[in-house]
A protein has these predicted regions:
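Glycine-rich ThDP/TPP pyrophosphate-binding loop and its adjacent helix/strand module
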Residues: 1-101
Length: 101
């Protein structure tokens, strides 16, 4: 999700391409967008069908708070207190998304 408690992953300790690291150790690795349920399901199938005798891994590329912009945009959103104002803003965003479906 690109963040840890004290900042972004790239600011603290860049992991570079995680899937490529798994491949270097002989794993069958697939990276997929972490908030796309259909793509995740397809990627699971792809790993199962193609890993043969290798171990398989699915790397989800996600964003902490995805879909709730007021949380997603916060730099330090790993452990945040949620007061009534923030809860109301988040719920309003989620209701807007729900109503657009």
């Amino acid at each position: 999700n690109k963040k840890q408690i004290d900042g972004t992953i790239d600011e603290c300790i860049s992991l570079l391409d995680i899937a490529e690291k798994f491949r270097a150790f002989g794993w069958y690795a697939v990276t997929v967008k972490g908030d796309d349920i259909e793509a995740i399901q397809e990627a699971f199938k792809q790993v199962r069908e193609n890993q043969s005798d290798k171990p398989g891994v699915l790397v989800l590329d996600g964003v902490k708070g995805s879909g709730v912009k007021c949380i997603e945009k916060m730099k330090f959103n790993h452990m945040i207190p949620v007061d009534k104002e923030l809860a109301d803003r988040c719920l309003a965003e989620l209701e807007a998304v729900k109503n657009s479906l």
